[in-house]
Amino acid sequence: MSELISVAGLVATTPRHLVTQDGLPITSFRLASSQRRFDRSQNKWIDGETNWYTVTGFRQLAINASTSVSKGDRILVTGKLRVRDWDNGERAGTSVEIEAESIGHDLSWGSAVFTRTVLVRETETSDTDSAAIDEAVDNLSKEFLQEAELVGNKKK
């Protein structure tokens, strides 16, 4: 599945930034998104169930996100949805990932100052580049699944 979605949520882990041997910048983090509703009888906001996503950005987006996004930030993400089943022999579960096309701060929760970056002209994506991206996403997904218990995404 590769649907384009937009999600608002809270950055739940410190973003990881790396550059592959081929020079591909990658930034990845976990995003927690909860629906909220106002309960008039209690006169307070109630959090609904939390959905967890692994968000990964590449190239210039990865560079910009690594310097702009921090754990605890409220953000908006638009990208391609990927849902993958996994089994490591001891546990099994489902990983929900977003390959980000854009990331920005949610201005409902605060203000931001925008700084334009100089863009480097990108060449057309090659099959080798696509394979490197897929491999990097798989490796990052495995790392995040191992750490998922630390941010409340425990699989049973």
Predicted feature residues:
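Acidic, gly/ser/pro-rich intrinsically disordered tails
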Residues: 1, 19-22, 107-156
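OB-fold and OB-like beta-barrel modules that bind single-stranded nucleic acids
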Residues: 5-12, 31, 71-82, 100
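Core FKBP-type peptidyl-prolyl cis-trans isomerase
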Residues: 5-47, 90-94
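Conserved positions in beta-strands of structured domains
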Residues: 11-12, 16-18, 58, 82, ...
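Short, acidic/hydrophobic/Gly-rich beta-strand patch recurrent on exposed beta strands
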Residues: 28-32, 54-56, 98-99
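A beta-strand/beta-hairpin structural motif
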Residues: 42-67
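Beta-rich strand-turn-strand
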Residues: 58-92
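OB-fold/S1-family single-stranded nucleic acid-binding modules
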Residues: 88-111
